[in-house]
Amino acid sequence: MAISKDDILEAVGSMTVMELNDLVKAFEEKFGVSAAALAVAAPGAGGAAAPAAEEKTEFDVILTAAGEKKVEVIKVVRAATGLGLKEAKDVVDGAPKAVKEGIAKADAEALKKQLEDAGAKVEIK
């Protein structure tokens, strides 16, 4: 018997956030994809190709180093991303790593300032 889409949606709907996180990681490993890359690419998927000369409107905030106040940096990462403590710590420990991707320039600059105020080294790409 094949599993229907409704069965899958029902199962996913009853999962906790941690279970969903594990499921996403399993998809990434099994199929060799990245959920972050899909989320960034998805909004433009239905439109026409953008001209090459167009100004960049989406930016990635990259944490290059946590600095000496690692706990403060973790707090800022949690507040900005909505991640749990372990996930935010993994981002900080895994530097250089993207904290947020595909955000507006003003939001990227604000997040960069918050992270730098907490003691982190940050770059915007």
Curated annotation (Swiss-Prot):
**MF GO annotations:** mRNA binding; structural constituent of ribosome
The record's listing under Gene3D superfamilies reads:
3.30.1390.10, Single helix bin
GO terms in the biological process aspect are: translation
**Manganese in keyword set:** no
Record's keyword terms, sorted: Ribonucleoprotein, Ribosomal protein
- List cellular component terms (GO): cytosolic large ribosomal subunit
Q: Which InterPro entries match?
A: Ribosomal_bL12 (IPR000206), Ribosomal_bL12_C (IPR013823), Ribosomal_bL12_C/ClpS-like (IPR014719), Ribosomal_bL12_oligo (IPR008932), Ribosomal_bL12_oligo_N_sf (IPR036235)
Question: NCBIfam families, alphabetically?
Answer: L12
Q: Which family does it belong to?
A: Belongs to the bacterial ribosomal protein bL12 family.
Summary of the function given for this chain in its UniProt record: Forms part of the ribosomal stalk which helps the ribosome interact with GTP-bound translation factors. Is thus essential for accurate translation.
Complex formation: Homodimer. Part of the ribosomal stalk of the 50S ribosomal subunit. Forms a multimeric L10(L12)X complex, where L10 forms an elongated spine to which 2 to 4 L12 dimers bind in a sequential fashion. Binds GTP-bound translation factors.
Q: What is this protein called?
A: Large ribosomal subunit protein bL12
**Source lineage:** Bacteria, Pseudomonadati, Pseudomonadota, Betaproteobacteria, Rhodocyclales
